[in-house]
């Protein structure tokens, strides 16, 4: 059964972790029963609306989401008649699927509808039954979302060019590249880590396919070992190809994942501008071109 009392906000530590992982502002949260197109039954999630994405957690205390739903292309939100007492039902109609949602009570159902329509339509809906204070919150969220989209250059997005150089696959205007990114080969990355271990032991570099990324690390457990991990771009996210793949929202989160999972044993490889690599002097120039202007690098 769903909770009858309004849930309390997540503790500050959990909030900060989720903010860091999702890299999106929190607009609304609460319990939802969700049925995706590939599910037969509803699943119970603690749900957060961040930006124009719904993040699903197994419970209030989880910091890692188990699923997410991008609703920026929402076609419409349709209400459903519910035979269950104190329960609101509606459907999120998206271009490629329909997602059925149930809320814990009719009031929270109106709030969810209000916030979802506000961030997707960029206007406060007039046909929701909310209290004055709740409507004020919608206007505040509307201004925050407009500002966020302007800052991330998402309003509007220009269609991609038909022809482009392979190097443009590294363009990440919305998420600048981490400091430990270097436009080097696997061999060069290995040499950098071996020659300058005091600067760090983890490098982010272009993948061998010129479309994705790779991470090269140097670990010293008994004896130095070099390992390479492929990081594949999947839509707006990045997937680390491990035994159990891990998907994260940006490259900064990818680096943070390795640092946290090794309890700080892996550190980003960062050098001073005054230091000398002792290798190809063009490496630094190439990396800066990728970071500042990847289209022309």
UniProtKB/Swiss-Prot annotation:
Keyword Glycoprotein: no
GO molecular function: macrophage colony-stimulating factor receptor binding; phosphotyrosine residue binding; protein tyrosine kinase activator activity; protein-macromolecule adaptor activity; receptor tyrosine kinase binding; transmembrane receptor protein tyrosine kinase adaptor activity
Residues with PTM Phosphotyrosine: 170
Domain of life: Eukaryota
Keyword Coiled coil carried by entry: no
Any single Pfam family the record assigns to this protein: PH
SUPFAM superfamilies: PH domain-like, SH2 domain
Entry's localization field: Nucleus; Cytoplasm; Mitochondrion
Domain spans labelled PH: 25-121
Tissue expr: Expression restricted to the bone marrow.
GO biological process, one term: positive regulation of microglial cell mediated cytotoxicity
GO cellular component: cytosol; mitochondrion; nuclear body; protein-containing complex
Principal subcellular localisation of the protein: nucleus
Main function: May function as an adapter molecule downstream of KIT in the proliferation or differentiation of hematopoietic stem cells.
Subunit and interaction comment: Interacts with URI1; the interaction is phosphorylation-dependent occurs in a growth-dependent manner. Interacts with KIT and CSF1R.
The protein's name in its UniProt record: Signal-transducing adaptor protein 1
Source species of the chain: Mus musculus (Mouse)
Originating gene: Stap1
């Amino acid at each position: 059964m769903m909770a009858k009392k309004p849930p309390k906000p997540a503790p500050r530590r959990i909030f900060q972790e989720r903010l860091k992982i999702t890299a999106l502002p929190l607009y609304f949260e609460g319990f939802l029963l969700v049925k995706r197109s590939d599910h037969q039954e509803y699943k119970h999630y603690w749900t957060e609306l961040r930006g124009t994405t719904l993040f699903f957690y197994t419970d209030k205390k989880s910091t890692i989401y188990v699923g997410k739903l991008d609703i920026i292309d929402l076609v419409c939100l349709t209400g459903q008649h519910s035979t269950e007492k104190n329960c609101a039902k509606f459907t999120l109609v998206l271009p490629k699927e329909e997602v059925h949602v149930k809320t814990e009570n009719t009031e929270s159902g109106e709030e969810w509808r209000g916030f979802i329509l506000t961030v997707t339509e960029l206007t406060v809906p007039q046909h929701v039954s909310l209290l004055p204070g709740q409507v004020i919150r919608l206007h505040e969220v509307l201004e925050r979302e407009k500002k966020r989209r302007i800052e991330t250059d998402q309003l509007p997005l220009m269609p991609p060019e038909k022809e482009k150089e392979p190097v443009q696959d590294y363009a990440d205007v919305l998420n600048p590249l981490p400091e430990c990114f270097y436009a080097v080969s696997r061999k060069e990355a290995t040499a950098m880590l071996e020659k300058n271990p005091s600067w760090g032991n983890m490098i982010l570099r272009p993948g061998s396919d010129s479309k994705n990324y790779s991470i090269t690390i140097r670990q010293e457990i008994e004896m130095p070992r070099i390992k390479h991990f492929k990081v594949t771009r999947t839509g707006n996210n990045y997937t680390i190809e491990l035994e159990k793949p891990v998907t994260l929202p940006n490259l900064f989160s990818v680096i943070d994942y390795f640092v946290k999972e090794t309890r700080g044993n892996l550190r980003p490889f960062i050098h001073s501008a005054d230091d000398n690599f002792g290798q190809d002097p063009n490496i630094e120039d190439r990396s800066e071109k990728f970071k500042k202007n990847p289209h022309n690098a």
